[in-house]
Design a protein with these regions (language model features):
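Conserved anion/nucleotide-ligand pocket segment
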Residues: 9-22
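Noncatalytic alpha-helical scaffolds and linker/capping helices
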Residues: 1-2
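AMP-forming adenylation/ATP pyrophosphatase catalytic core
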Residues: 8-11, 26-133
Length: 133
């Protein structure tokens, strides 16, 4: 219902106010898509050696936090585990990167719809270990 409201009311109103707004939005979207693809290629070239189920915390602490988040997200995706929420990602960063993790450090998550298996990250021998829950 919201989608129809946007399509039938909001977009025509925008089109009246700004000429070729849909075309501009489409062009911007395409530009972002291309930039995203470029980022993905460069990211994987630079950090592919870290994208794994076992990652040294020391290596992650030497990298800017936005890249650490992407390394963790790519590693989770590689294991076919449900992607954690933004809040859980923040907890992972706080627990393993911003703090000094120990053997009891653990962050886990699930999906309410059970569409994908949940995951957990623990700390062992200086590494975070990403596994299915």
């Amino acid at each position: 219902q919201d989608r129809n409201y946007i399509r039938n009311n909001i977009i025509p109103s925008i089109e009246q106010r700004w000429v070729k707004a849909s075309s501009r939005i489409s062009n911007t979207s395409e530009f972002i898509k291309i930039k995203n693809q470029s980022y993905e290629i460069l990211f994987e070239e630079k950090f592919n050696h870290l994208i794994n189920k076992k990652i040294k915390v020391k290596d992650l602490k030497e990298i800017d936090e936005p890249f650490v988040v992407d390394i963790i997200r790519h590693s989770i995706r590689k294991q076919n585990i449900a992607m954690p929420s933004k809040k859980v990602i923040e907890e992972i960063i706080k627990t393993f990167i911003q703090s000094n993790p120990g053997p009891k450090s653990l962050v886990s998550w699930t999906r309410a719809d059970k569409d994908q298996v949940g995951g957990e990250i623990c700390y062992k021998d200086g590494c975070i270990i990403i596994s299915k829950k």
